[in-house]
Amino acid sequence: MAFQILLNVFLAFCWMFLSNSPSAAGFITGYILGMLSLFFFRRFFTRQFYLWKLISIIKLCFIFIKELYLANVSVMKSVLSPKLNIRPGIFAFKTELTKDWEITMLSLLITLTPGTLVMDISDDRTILYIHAMDIEDAEKAIFDIRESFEKAIQEVSR
């Protein structure tokens, strides 16, 4: 992926200087043309076209922002209500992620979401122990994490 991005930037600079338009518009035009040429010659690269991975990263960011907003609203409702009606709990989340950076990313996304905190990871790196501030159903929480964060991380890494 990094090689394709650097090659695309190199092609953009070549286009910008060969077309005698050293400006941001010339660079962007060269970048788009370079991206198209890399797309057409993608079968010569060992990895998939980098734009798909970039789209997956952007999708993961939007999922995190959405979950962050929803969790903030939920925590705000709990904190501002006159009667503190929460059900804190700890549940075990069995992850399908295998690489260390994937598990770290999942742990960070869960911890950065208000109301949840990854307390520990099992020695075999397959189970995350998560504390939730207000949890009604552990199975629903596991399903939500698996369908949002874990699925998006798998799209980025594979």
Curated annotation (Swiss-Prot):
GO cellular component: plasma membrane
Keyword hit for Transmembrane helix: yes
Lineage top rank: taxon: Bacteria
Primary residence: membrane
Transmembrane intervals: 21-41, 51-71
NCBIfam families for the chain: PRK08965.1-1 (NF006517), PRK12651.1-3 (NF009292)
Family: Belongs to the CPA3 antiporters (TC 2.A.63) subunit E family.
Subunit structure: Forms a heterooligomeric complex that consists of seven subunits: MrpA, MrpB, MrpC, MrpD, MrpE, MrpF and MrpG.
Record protein name field: Na(+)/H(+) antiporter subunit E
Organism: Bacillus subtilis (strain 168)
